[in-house]
Amino acid sequence: MNRLSTKLVVAIGIGSALYGILGLWGFSIAPNTFIKPALAILTVFGALFGPVAGLLIGLIGHTVTDTIAGWSIWWGWVISSGIIGFTMGFIQKRVGFSVKNGTYNKGDISYLAITGLIGIVIAIIFAGAFDIIVMGEPFDKIVIQVLGATIADVIVFLVLGLPITIGLAKSNKKHTHLKIEK
């Protein structure tokens, strides 16, 4: 069985705290649905530390947000944050990709974009279905929430998460195009 390294546990703790606290702020776009810039944390930490870290940061961080805000914990949405973090972490498993070393190519960026978008859609549909089936929420309300949350998460992912992750990788590149003249 693989054990979590100290570094990974610390990263999960920091990522969860950041995601949990930053998740308290957002812009309302539908009933109980917000554009939350905190989603970028799942992209960055998933790309840096992998799917397990992304999953745990999403689960723990969203639980922290709901607890601090005083809302009851909406487990379908907590799990959806975990799913999003998990799928954002797939990129870290690609050979040749490393935010830490600044190694990536256009295919890696496309892969992150596609897996991120698919993960968001799957996660939000899961949360909506969970709310209808388990929580007994009205279908009409959930359709609005699912559409709003999907649009909001896609915007944050494309405008913040993806560019920040690419920017971090670029800043960590080990080589430049500068040449030493003799």
Swiss-Prot record:
Taxonomic superkingdom: Bacteria
Family matches, as InterPro entries: ECF_substrate-spec-like (IPR009825), UPF0397 (IPR022914)
Pfam name, any one: ECF-ribofla_trS
Record's subcellular location: Cell membrane
Transmembrane segments: 9-29, 40-60, 71-91, 114-134, 142-162
Protein's UniProt keywords contain Transmembrane helix: yes
Keywords, in A-Z order: Cell membrane, Membrane, Transmembrane, Transmembrane helix
One cellular component term from this protein's GO annotations in UniProt: plasma membrane
Membrane-topology annotation of the record: Multi-pass membrane protein
Disulphide bridges, residue numbers: none
Similarity section: Belongs to the UPF0397 family.
Protein name from the UniProt record: UPF0397 protein BA_2640/GBAA_2640/BAS2460
Organism: Bacillus anthracis
